[in-house]
Amino acid sequence: MKNEDSTQIFEVFVDADSCPVKDEIELVAESYKVKVTFVSSYAHNMTVGPTSKVVMVDAEREAVDLYIANHIKKKDVCVTHDYGLASLLLTKGATVISPRGQMFDHTIIDSLLAQRHQSQKDRRAGKKTKGPRAYLKGDRERFIQQFEKILSNRAGI
């Protein structure tokens, strides 16, 4: 979204390594003329349209998260399924949404982090834990609806 002096008001960052809605992000963002930066490790090859860019980082465990955390600003938007990254970005004033269309905010992030921590403890103790449920058409539709709502609110529409 651009204002009168053509200065970018906000940007969208995408934790792109395992993001199932890259095409949808580009389509919606392009309709609002919003810059999108897909951040991915060298282990994942990807191409994007002419209005987006890809930043490739090392394949280290948290390299994508660190890049996004170091470059995101207040009012920027991030698409990620990573609860830890979401928590960090919320403290910076960013809007964070999952690829399933779940909005992360301060009221739910602590419980999500606690659930993740408990699952990690259970796995280390040898217990079986559930993985994420399958990504469904409804998840994709919910994401598009929520993402469009975020961008239209930012654009003042």
From Swiss-Prot:
Leader sequence segment: none
Pfam families: DUF188
InterPro entries per the UniProt record, alphabetical: UPF0178
Source organism, top-level taxon: Bacteria
Family: Belongs to the UPF0178 family.
Alphabetized PANTHER family for the sequence: UPF0178 PROTEIN YAII (PTHR35146:SF1)
Protein name: UPF0178 protein BH1374
Organism of origin: Halalkalibacterium halodurans (strain ATCC BAA-125 / DSM 18197 / FERM 7344 / JCM 9153 / C-125)
